[in-house]
Structure formats: structure tokens, C-alpha cells
């Protein structure tokens, strides 16, 4: 679970302008952080299938947002996956 401060830090790092909180970049960065934390949880709790299902939903949502960004602006897409260290 992300704290309010951690969430604000991620938003500040990826926002496009001062009041930006919902751009695809910000949403993808927040999802990536949640996915990484859930991955760590699942390394320890291997039989937590409910959380695994949530993880798969989040990965699917992130993939949809990445596909949207790729169609909308390929340069922003490439820059974001470079920053986040994602494949593809």
C-alpha cells in the first residue's frame, strides 16, 4: 500500500505540469509502483491467489494505458518506459 507521501512523490516526478495528477504517465507510474510492491508480497506469500488476481488486473490496466500512450504520442511512451525500466 502506498502512503500519501509516496504517492505525491511519484506524481511530482512524472507529472507534465503543476496540477497534473491524471495523465497516462502518472497513472502508469503509480500502477507500476503498486505492481512492484505486490510482486514483493507474492514472493513471500506464494499461495495468495486473491492478490495474484489483483496483480493481473493491475498489469492489464497498465498495459491498456501504455497502449493508449503509444498510439497517442510514441515519444512520450518511449521516454516513460525508459524512465520506469519496463520492457518493450
From Swiss-Prot:
Disulfide bonding pattern of the chain: none
InterPro entries, per the entry: Ribosomal_uS15, Ribosomal_uS15_bac-type, uS15_NS1_RNA-bd_sf
Superkingdom to which the source organism belongs: Bacteria
Keywords tagged on the record: Ribonucleoprotein, Ribosomal protein, RNA-binding, rRNA-binding
GO cellular component: cytosolic small ribosomal subunit
Presence of the UniProt keyword Membrane in the record: no
UniProt record, GO biological process: translation
CDD domains linked: Ribosomal_S15p_S13e (cd00353)
Subunit comment: Part of the 30S ribosomal subunit. Forms a bridge to the 50S subunit in the 70S ribosome, contacting the 23S rRNA.
Function: One of the primary rRNA binding proteins, it binds directly to 16S rRNA where it helps nucleate assembly of the platform of the 30S subunit by binding and bridging several RNA helices of the 16S rRNA. Forms an intersubunit bridge (bridge B4) with the 23S rRNA of the 50S subunit in the ribosome.
Name listed for the protein in its UniProt record: Small ribosomal subunit protein uS15
Biological source species: Caldicellulosiruptor saccharolyticus (strain ATCC 43494 / DSM 8903 / Tp8T 6331)
Amino acid at each position: 500500500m502506498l502512503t500519501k507521501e509516496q504517492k505525491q512523490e511519484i506524481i511530482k516526478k512524472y507529472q507534465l505540469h503543476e496540477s497534473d495528477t491524471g495523465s497516462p504517465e502518472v497513472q502508469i507510474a503509480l500502477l507500476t509502483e503498486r505492481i512492484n510492491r505486490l510482486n514483493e508480497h507474492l514472493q513471500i506469500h506464494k499461495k495468495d491467489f486473491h492478490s495474484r488476481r489483483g496483480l493481473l488486473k493491475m498489469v492489464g490496466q497498465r498495459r491498456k494505458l501504455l497502449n493508449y500512450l503509444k498510439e497517442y504520442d510514441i515519444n512520450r511512451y518511449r521516454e516513460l518506459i525508459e524512465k520506469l525500466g519496463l520492457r518493450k
